[in-house]
C-alpha cells in the first residue's frame, strides 16, 4: 500500500478542499420517464405520479416535490392518497401493496416507505384469486378494500396491512343476497370498480366486469341495490349526493342509474353512445360532476369511433351544449378533475382537468370559456422534440433576462391566466442567488430557453429556426384549428410532437453571449445561424454565405445528405431572437464545434472537414481551413457514416487482440489480478475511505493517423494572448482536432471606428501536433496570474477584472488522455497530467468552474471540472494540474448520459437520465441548489385558483449519490436514475435520441455533441 500513498499529505489543504468541494445529486428536471399511474389528494392538493421503473413522484405548489423508489423496481399500476392524510398506497404489477408517508425531519418533509404487503390466497388457489384489480381507501383511513380478478373483495387494515378475513366480501356472498332473477354466475368475473358512498361510509359500490353493480351494506353484510347492464362494465361514477350512478361500458356507451328504494332493479334513466351510431371503442372512465349553475360536466376517456378515430388518445368534456374531445399525441395514462375539496359540499364545481399522458402532463382550465390549457410550472416535457444538445449560461444580466421573458410571454397568449391549481405544501427553498439559463437544442430545429436558476425548470422562450428554410410544413400552420362542423370535435392539446419535418434541422451546437444578446446556433446539415435579440417583430431577408471547407481539395465527393434549402425573400420573425445571417458549410456535414466572440463580432465553426471564421458584422468570410487527412475518406460519406471496410476492421481487431495480450502479460507482475481496476470501485472498507491514493498511470500509446477521423474539429477557442512574440498580444483563434492537432491563427481586428471599413485578417501562426495524437477536447489560455481569460465583454461590464497582460501567458491543452500546459508564445511544454489512472479512461467533457468556499465569502478558486467516459467527475487544479477530488457520477454503461452532460460556471452540472429528464448535480459546497419543502395534513386548502402563476419546484428527498473521495460524504439517496438506468430499453432510447441513426446516407442527425470547448470560462 505504501507506493499508492501520495507524498506530502497536507491537512490544511484537505480541510480547504472540504470547504470547496462536495458532490450532491440534487433534483431531477423534466417529465418522468414512462409514467404508469396517477393519483391526487383533494385535501392536500398533491399530485402523485408512478412510473414503470418503480418510482413515485409527488408534486404540490411550485417548489414542492418528493421522490421515492420501490426496491423491487416493478411498475406502479395504481396510486391512492389517503383522504386527509400525508400517506399514500401504491400497487405494483407484482401484486404488492406499499404504504408511504410524508414525515417531518429537520424541519422538512421526507417521503418514506413504511410497510409493504402481498395479498395471499389459500393454499392451492389460482393466482387470479388474489390478483388485485381495484384499490379503495376507506374514508376512515384505517381500511383498504381490494377488488380482485376472482370477484372477491378483501379487506386490509392500515397501517400494518393486516388482512381481515372475516370482512371479505366474496362473490358467493353477493350472489346469495341477490334476488332470484339476478342470480347468474356469468354476472361476476373480476371487480372493475369500487366506490364509497359520498355521504354514508357504511356503503360501498362494487362493479363487476360482466355488468353487475351492487351497493353493499358493510354493517349488515347485505345488498342494498343492484343494477345489471347488458354491456361489459369498464368503470362507474357515484354522484356527490349519492342519488345517481353513471356507468361506462366497452361498446362506447354510458348509462345513468337512479339510486332509489322504490325500484330494486331499475332501468337506466338514460343510455347514450356519445360518438355513435357506428361502433365505438370502450369508455374506460367517466365522471359526472355537478355545478351550481345546474348543468353538469360529463368527462370521459375513450369512446371514439373505432374505424376512423380508434387510434386517437382522447378525453371528452361535455357541458352546457359545448363538447370537445381533447386529442393527445401520446397514450393517456390517467386523468383527474379538480373539484370542491370539502366532501360535505353540495356541488362538485370542477375547475381544472389534469391529464397524465405517456409523454406529458396537460392541465385544462374548465372555468374559462374555450377551456384553454394552463401553463406548467414544472413537469415540462423537455423531449417534446428530441433533445440534441445543451448549453448553460450562468448569471444572466437582468436586462437580457427581462427581454427573453417578454418575448416568451407573447408566445403564451393561448394559455389560461389561472393560477397553478395544484398548490399543496410549502417550499422552504430560498430564492436563487442569480439567474441561470439552460438552452436545449432539438431535432425539429428549435432552441428552448429554460429558467435553471432554482430547483424548478421553467420554459421561458422557444426559438424556431424552421422559418429560415424551405420545409414540407408551413410554419404558420395551426395544428389546433378545428372546423365548427367537424365531428368528433377534436382539439389537439399538449406540446409533445415526436415527428420532425426534416431531421437536418436538428440543432447540434449553441453559443449565447449574455452581454450582447447575440446567439449562434449550428445544425445537422452544416447550417450556422447568427441571431440577435429584437424586442419587435421584423420582416427581413436572411443573408446567406457559403463556406467551402474543401476548396483546396480535389477528388473528394460528398455522399451524405444535401444542404437545407433556404428562403430567398424576406421572412417575418416574431419578437425574440431573429437570424440575420446564415453560413452554410460545404459539404453540409454536422457542425461539431462552435464559438462566438461578440466583442470582435466573429463566429467560428468546425465540422469533420475543417473549420472557418466568419465576420458577422461585415457579413463576410474571413478564412476556411481544411483539416482532412488523406485517410479521412469516410468523412465524405456523411456525418452519420461510421462503417469501416471489413478488411480494415479485421486488421484493427487483430492488432487490438495482440496489444491486449502483450499488455496483460506485462501487467501481471505489478500486483494481483484486478488491482488496476481498484480505482473505479467504491471504497467499501472504512480504513480506505479517507486515504488519498496516487493514481497508477499507464503508458499512453500513440495513435495512428488512420485510427479515426483526424480532421474532425472538436473544439474552438478565442483568446487575446501572446501568439507571435512576448512583446505584443493579439486576438487569436485556436482549433483542436480529433487527430491531436492544434491550429492557432492570429487575427487582426480593426478598431471600432474602422470596423466596417477594414476587413478582419487572419494568419496561421502555429500548428502543434500532440505526440500521442489523442483528440483535443479543450483549449484554454491563462493570463499572467494563471487565471483563465474572462469572457468577451465581461470586463467591459465590470463583472471581471482585466486579465494580467504583463506576465507570461500559458496554454492549456486538454486531450482525451492528458492535460498539458505550454508557455506562450514559444509553446514549450511546462506541465502535464496523464488522466490514465483507470484503464480505458478518456476525457469526455471539460470546463472551467469557480468554486467558492462555504466558510469564507471572499475566497474561491478556479479549477477544471472533468468528466470521463467511465462516468467519473474529477476536479483538477489550475495551473498546477493537481487532482483535487474524484466522484462517481454517471454509470459507465450510460454512454448517452455521459454524452449529454453539461457543466456550469459555478460547479454544477446536468445530464440526461432518460429522454425526458435531466439530473442536476453539484460539485460545490457553496453553489448548491438544495430543495426543501414541507407538507402538513392539518393545512387543508379549499381556496380556488385565481389568476397568475409563480412556478417553482423542489423535492425533499435526499438525492445524493455516488462516491466522495474527499470532503463530507452524504448517504446516497434513492434517485430515479438508479431505476431508469437499470433498464436497457431506457439506455437504448436515450442513446438513440442523442446519437441518431448512424446508417450511411441517412438524414438522421448525429445528435451526441462530440467534444467540449473551453470558452473563456463559460459553460457549454
UniProtKB/Swiss-Prot annotation:
InterPro entries: Lethal2_giant, LLGL2, WD40/YVTN_repeat-like_dom_sf, WD40_repeat_dom_sf, WD40_rpt. The modification Phosphoserine is found at residues 653, 965, 1015. One of its GO terms (molecular function) is GTPase activator activity. The keyword Iron-sulfur does not apply. It is found in: Cytoplasm. WD repeats lie at residues 36-69, 76-117, 132-169, 193-227, 233-268, 282-324, 332-366, 388-464, 508-583, 592-653, 713-769, 778-830, 835-888, 902-925. The keyword Cell cycle applies. Phosphorylated at Ser-653 by PRKCI. Phosphorylation is enhanced during cell polarization induced by calcium. Phosphorylation may occur during the cell-cell contact-induced cell polarization and may contribute to the segregation of LLGL2 from the PRKCI/aPKC and PARD6B/Par-6 complex. It comes from the Eukaryota. Signal peptide: none annotated. Residues 653-689, 938-975, 992-1020 are annotated as: Disordered. Keywords: Cell cycle, Cell division, Cytoplasm, Exocytosis, Phosphoprotein, Repeat, WD repeat. GO terms for biological process: branching involved in labyrinthine layer morphogenesis; cell division; cortical actin cytoskeleton organization; establishment of spindle orientation; establishment or maintenance of epithelial cell apical/basal polarity; establishment or maintenance of polarity of embryonic epithelium; exocytosis; Golgi to plasma membrane transport. Coiled coil: none annotated. Residues 653-669 have a biased composition (Basic residues). Overexpression of LLGL2 inhibits the tight junction formation. This is LLGL scribble cell polarity complex component 2. It comes from Homo sapiens. The gene is LLGL2.
Amino acid at each position: 500500500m505504501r507506493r499508492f500513498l501520495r507524498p506530502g499529505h497536507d491537512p490544511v489543504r484537505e480541510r480547504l478542499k472540504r470547504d470547496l468541494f462536495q458532490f450532491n445529486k440534487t433534483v431531477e428536471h423534466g417529465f418522468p420517464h414512462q409514467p404508469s399511474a396517477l393519483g391526487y389528494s383533494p385535501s392536500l392538493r398533491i399530485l402523485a405520479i408512478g412510473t414503470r421503473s418503480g418510482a413515485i413522484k409527488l408534486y404540490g405548489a411550485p417548489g414542492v416535490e418528493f421522490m421515492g423508489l420501490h426496491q423491487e423496481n416493478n411498475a406502479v399500476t395504481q396510486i391512492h392518497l389517503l383522504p386527509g392524510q400525508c400517506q399514500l398506497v401504491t400497487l405494483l404489477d407484482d401484486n404488492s401493496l406499499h404504504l408511504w408517508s410524508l414525515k417531518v425531519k429537520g424541519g422538512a418533509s421526507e417521503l418514506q416507505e413504511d410497510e409493504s404487503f402481498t395479498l395471499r390466497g389459500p393454499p392451492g388457489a389460482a393466482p387470479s384469486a388474489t390478483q388485485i384489480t381495484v384499490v379503495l381507501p376507506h374514508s376512515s383511513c384505517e381500511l383498504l378494500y381490494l377488488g380482485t380478478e376472482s370477484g372477491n373483495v378483501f379487506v386490509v387494515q392500515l397501517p400494518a396491512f393486516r388482512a381481515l378475513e372475516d370482512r371479505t366480501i366474496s362473490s358467493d356472498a353477493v350472489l346469495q343476497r341477490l334476488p332470484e332473477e339476478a342470480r347468474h354466475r356469468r354476472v361476476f368475473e373480476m371487480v372493475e370498480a369500487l366506490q364509497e358512498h359520498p355521504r354514508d361510509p357504511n356503503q360501498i359500490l362494487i362493479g363487476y366486469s360482466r355488468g353487475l353493480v351492487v351497493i353493499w351494506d358493510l354493517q349488515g353484510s347485505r345488498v342494498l341495490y343492484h343494477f345489471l347492464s347488458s354491456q361489459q362494465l369498464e368503470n362507474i361514477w357515484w354522484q356527490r349526493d349519492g342519488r345517481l350512478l353513471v356507468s361506462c361500458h366497452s361498446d362506447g356507451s354510458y348509462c345513468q342509474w337512479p339510486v332509489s328504494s322504490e325500484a330494486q332493479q331499475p332501468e337506466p334513466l338514460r343510455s347514450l353512445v356519445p360518438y355513435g351510431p357506428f361502433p365505438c371503442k370502450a369508455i374506460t372512465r367517466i365522471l359526472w360532476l355537478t355545478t351550481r349553475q345546474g348543468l353538469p360536466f360529463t368527462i370521459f376517456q375513450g369512446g371514439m369511433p373505432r374505424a376512423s378515430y380508434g387510434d386517437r388518445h382522447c378525453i371528452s368534456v361535455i357541458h352546457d351544449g359545448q363538447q370537445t374531445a381533447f386529442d393527445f399525441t401520446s397514450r393517456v395514462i390517467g386523468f383527474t378533475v379538480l373539484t370542491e375539496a370539502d366532501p360535505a359540499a353540495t356541488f362538485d364545481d370542477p375547475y381544472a382537468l389534469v391529464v397524465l399522458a405517456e409523454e406529458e402532463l396537460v392541465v385544462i382550465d374548465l372555468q374559462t370559456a374555450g377551456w384553454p390549457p394552463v401553463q406548467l410550472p414544472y413537469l415540462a416535457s423537455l423531449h417534446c422534440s428530441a433533445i440534441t444538445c445543451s448549453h448553460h449560461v450562468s448569471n444572466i444580466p437582468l436586462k437580457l433576462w427581462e427581454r427573453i421573458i417578454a418575448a416568451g410571454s407573447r408566445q403564451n397568449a393561448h394559455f389560461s391566466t389561472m393560477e397553478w391549481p395544484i398548490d399543496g405544501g410549502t417550499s422552504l427553498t430560498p430564492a436563487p442567488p442569480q439567474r441561470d439559463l439552460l438552452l436545449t437544442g432539438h431535432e425539429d430545429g428549435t432552441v428552448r430557453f429554460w429558467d435553471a436558476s432554482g430547483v424548478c425548470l421553467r420554459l421561458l422562450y422557444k426559438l424556431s429556426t424552421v422559418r429560415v428554410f424551405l420545409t414540407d410544413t408551413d410554419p404558420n400552420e395551426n395544428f389546433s384549428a378545428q372546423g365548427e362542423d367537424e365531428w368528433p370535435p377534436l382539439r389537439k392539446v399538449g406540446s409533445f410532437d415526436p415527428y420532425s419535418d426534416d431531421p437536418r434541422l436538428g440543432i447540434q451546437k449553441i453559443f449565447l453571449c449574455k452581454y450582447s444578446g447575440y446567439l449562434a446556433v449550428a445544425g445537422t446539415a452544416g447550417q450556422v445561424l447568427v441571431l440577435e435579440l429584437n424586442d419587435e417583430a421584423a420582416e427581413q431577408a436572411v443573408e446567406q454565405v457559403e463556406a467551402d471547407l474543401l476548396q483546396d481539395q480535389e477528388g473528394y465527393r460528398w455522399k451524405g445528405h444535401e444542404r437545407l434549402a433556404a428562403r430567398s425573400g424576406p421572412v417575418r420573425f416574431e419578437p425574440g431572437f431573429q437570424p440575420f445571417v446564415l453560413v452554410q458549410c460545404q459539404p453540409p456535414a454536422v457542425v461539431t464545434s462552435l464559438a462566438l466572440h461578440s466583442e470582435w463580432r466573429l463566429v467560428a465553426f468546425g465540422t469533420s472537414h475543417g473549420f472557418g471564421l466568419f465576420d458577422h458584422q461585415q457579413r463576410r468570410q474571413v478564412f476556411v481551413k481544411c483539416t482532412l487527412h488523406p485517410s479521412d475518406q469516410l468523412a465524405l460519406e456523411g456525418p452519420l457514416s461510421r462503417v469501416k471496410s471489413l478488411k480494415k476492421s479485421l486488421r484493427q481487431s487483430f492488432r487490438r487482440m495482440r496489444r491486449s495480450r502483450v499488455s496483460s502479460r506485462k501487467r501481471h507482475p505489478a500486483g494481483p489480478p484486478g488491482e488496476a481496476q481498484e480505482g473505479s470501485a467504491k471504497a467499501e472498507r472504512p480504513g480506505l475511505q479517507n486515504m488519498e491514493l496516487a493514481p497508477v498511470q499507464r503508458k499512453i500509446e500513440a495513435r495512428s493517423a488512420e485510427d479515426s477521423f483526424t480532421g474532425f474539429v472538436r473544439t474552438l477557442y478565442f483568446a487575446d494572448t501572446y501568439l507571435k512574440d512576448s512583446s505584443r498580444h493579439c486576438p487569436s483563434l485556436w482549433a483542436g482536432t480529433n487527430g491531436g492537432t492544434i491550429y492557432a491563427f492570429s487575427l487582426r481586428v480593426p478598431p471600432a471606428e474602422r470596423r466596417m471599413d477594414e476587413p478582419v485578417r487572419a494568419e496561421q501562426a502555429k500548428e502543434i501536433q500532440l505526440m500521442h495524437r489523442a483528440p483535443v477536447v479543450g483549449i484554454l489560455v491563462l493570463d499572467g496570474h494563471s487565471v483563465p481569460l474572462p469572457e468577451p465583454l465581461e470586463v467591459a461590464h465590470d463583472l471581471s477584472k482585466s486579465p494580467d497582460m504583463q506576465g507570461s501567458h500559458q496554454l492549456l491543452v486538454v486531450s482525451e488522455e492528458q492535460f498539458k500546459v505550454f508557455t506562450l508564445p514559444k509553446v514549450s511544454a511546462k506541465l502535464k497530467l496523464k488522466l490514465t489512472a483507470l484503464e480505458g479512461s478518456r476525457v469526455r467533457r471539460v470546463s472551467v468552474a469557480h468554486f467558492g468556499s462555504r466558510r469564507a465569502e471572499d475566497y474561491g478558486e478556479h479549477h477544471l471540472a472533468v468528466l470521463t467516459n467511465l462516468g467519473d467527475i474529477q476536479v483538477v487544479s489550475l495551473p498546477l494540474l493537481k487532482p483535487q477530488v474524484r466522484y462517481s457520477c454517471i454509470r459507465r454503461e450510460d454512454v448517452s448520459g455521459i454524452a449529454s452532460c453539461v457543466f456550469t460556471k459555478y460547479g454544477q452540472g446536468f445530464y440526461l437520465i432518460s429522454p425526458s429528464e435531466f439530473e442536476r448535480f453539484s460539485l460545490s459546497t457553496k453553489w448548491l441548489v438544495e430543495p426543501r419543502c414541507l407538507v402538513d395534513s392539518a393545512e387543508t386548502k379549499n381556496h380556488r385558483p385565481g389568476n397568475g402563476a409563480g412556478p417553482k419546484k423542489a423535492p425533499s428527498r435526499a438525492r445524493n449519490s455516488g462516491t466522495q473521495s474527499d470532503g463530507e460524504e452524504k448517504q446516497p439517496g434513492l434517485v430515479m436514475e438508479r431505476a431508469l438506468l437499470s433498464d436497457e430499453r431506457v439506455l437504448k432510447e436515450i442513446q438513440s435520441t442523442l446519437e441518431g441513426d448512424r446508417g450511411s446516407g441517412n438524414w438522421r442527425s448525429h445528435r451526441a455533441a462530440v467534444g467540449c470547448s473551453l470558452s473563456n470560462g463559460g459553460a457549454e
